[in-house]
Amino acid sequence: LRGGKYQELDFYGGTLTGIQEKLPYLKDMGIDIIYLNPIFRARSNHRYDTGDYTQVDPLCGTNTEFTELCEAAKKVGIRVMLDGVFSHTGEDSVYFNHFGHYPTLGAYQGQSSPYFDWYTFNHYPEDYKAWWGILSLPELRKDNPEYQKFMFQPHEGVVPRWIEAGSCGWRLDVADELPVDFLRKLRAAAKAADPEAVVLGEVWEDASNKVAYGETRCYCTGDTL
């Protein structure tokens, strides 16, 4: 906080190699799992505005350093879990590319973009559906087949790719805002990559009796979370 205001563009350091260097200390504390907040390339310091699901943010490290951390942690009995933000991206992303910072044609830049149908535009390009109305977080269409392929395709999809890179699973941001069908496919993709993979969801209310967006959620049946 500076002057009582939240500074989402202030960065304070901390890297994957720094965590790896502290593994003996963490082991001595009795820690057996490290849950990382989002580490993918993003504009903000919190990184819940994903810019590229395939790349670790350079401020945190590299994809190779993530795998090295997971391998080193596993040797001392510690697992590493990633945070998945799959309900929305950042406006400053490969996929939306509001500011043209990425070489790809983003959905905001042209209707011929391969990512155009990932989003919902009411009046193109300025009026689009955003997570809780926050325009910096354009909401994804979770039912879009190409988006699902990007997420779940064996080996190459985001979900299995990062498990195969070393993550023990996923903690899902706003899981109760993800459709049940999407969650089932996500869990199946994770388990196909690693039968022991963990899929943990952020659900604010009683998960055994949860109704979200007019639908009773089946979190306790074992096929979503």
Residue ranges: model-predicted function:
Residues 27-29, 74, 109, 163-164, ...:
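Extracellular/periplasmic catalytic domains that process cell-envelope and extracellular macromolecules
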Residues 1-82, 87-89, 94-98, 149:
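N-terminal structural segment of carbohydrate-active enzymes
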Residues 49-54, 136-138, 168-170:
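Short amphipathic alpha-helical segments
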Residues 15, 19-22, 65, 69, ...:
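Alpha-helical packing segments of well-folded alpha/beta enzyme cores
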Residues 45-57, 86-129, 212-224:
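Aromatic- and acidic-residue-enriched segments that line the glycan-binding/catalytic groove
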Residues 67-78, 87-88, 93-104, 158-160, ...:
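Active-site-proximal helices and loops of the catalytic beta/alpha 8
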Residues 94-156, 160-165, 175:
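Active-site-adjacent "subsite" loops/lids of carbohydrate-active enzymes
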Residues 9, 141, 169-172:
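Active-site oxyanion-binding pockets that recognize sulfate/phosphate
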